[in-house]
């Protein structure tokens, strides 16, 4: 796992996940591009990387390992509120996601499906990342 301090940009997004994905895309490519919603099986969010942040959806259902196994990403980037990007392998990401995931349920209006999401960013999460970078 590696840690990289990213440069902030004036993002157009109010949604934190989209804002951080746009910042990550800028730091990876030098271009300001819109965040998009690609399927995990297609190739990742940017240059083969899956980009995540606090409260991001990890997968539908409860099987994180099966989701990561079917994911076409070459690596994973978790970007913190302080814009530190932690780049992880599939194995590291599985360990991280398993440790800091929480099971949520969509509203009945939206079908009531379960999904795994990252918890809010915490001191424990940041310490876990720093200890492994």
Segments (PLM) and residue ranges:
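Nucleic-acid endonuclease domains
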Residues: 1-133
């Amino acid at each position: 796992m590696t840690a990289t301090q990213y440069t902030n940009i004036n993002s157009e997004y109010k949604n934190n996940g989209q804002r951080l994905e746009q910042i990550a895309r800028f730091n990876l490519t030098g271009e300001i591009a819109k965040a998009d919603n690609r399927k995990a099986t297609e190739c990742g969010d940017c240059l083969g990387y899956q980009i995540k942040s606090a409260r991001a959806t990890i997968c539908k259902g409860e099987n994180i390992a099966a989701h990561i196994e079917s994911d076409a990403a070459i690596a994973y980037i978790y970007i913190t509120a302080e814009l530190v990007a932690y780049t992880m392998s599939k194995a590291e990401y599985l360990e991280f996601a398993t440790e800091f995931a929480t099971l949520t349920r969509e509203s009945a209006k939206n079908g009531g499906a379960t999904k795994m999401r990252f918890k809010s960013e915490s001191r424990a999460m940041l310490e876990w990342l720093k200890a492994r970078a």
